[in-house]
Structure formats: structure tokens, C-alpha cells
UniProtKB/Swiss-Prot annotation:
Name the record gives this protein: Large ribosomal subunit protein uL24
Keyword rRNA-binding: yes
GO molecular function, one term: structural constituent of ribosome
Subunit description: Part of the 50S ribosomal subunit.
PANTHER family: MITOCHONDRIAL RIBOSOMAL PROTEIN L24
Any one GO biological process: translation
Amino acid sequence: MQKIRRDDEIIVIAGKDKGKRGKVLKVLADDRLVVGGINLVKRHTKPNPMSGVQGGIVEKEAPLHASNVAIFNSETNKADRVGFKIEDGKKIRVFKSTQKPVGA
């Protein structure tokens, strides 16, 4: 079970975007995350009239490593760590500071 999943709100704790918050758009297999509005890079794209793609410089989100982010606890307004608990035979994610379920 992953500690950070899609649609979790995270805060960047290291790197050029330190302190910024965003929502996880995609989780990649090698412990990398794509987060909305964070780690933006410029990509030069060729025009492709067949698929209707206009050429130019496009800004898009690049993946960043999971070790550079922490899950954001909206109750405490701080970065938090994730632990696991078994309730009713199911494994659930909980915030370490409050012991409340993540996303509830």
C-alpha cells in the first residue's frame, strides 16, 4: 500500500518549489509523483497538423521524487507523515500526528 496516492494534497519539502502545495495527478512506479502546478518545465513541441497540435513552447508538470514531498494535513495546516492502521480487517492510512484517517 502506498503512502501517497492520486488526489492527495501534498506539500513540497525540498527543491526549487519548496513550500508549495498541490494535488497529486499521477503516481509513477519508481517513487515519482506528478503534482499539479509544481515542478513546471518548458517543452518545445513541433507542430503536427494531423493531430491538431500547435507548435511552440509548452509548460508542463515534470515528475518529482516522493522523498521531496510530504502529505499535507489540513487539520493541523502542516506537513505530516503517514502510518497504517487495521480497522475492521482493512488496512487504512492515518496521519501520524492526529491518528485520523487520510482523506476523511
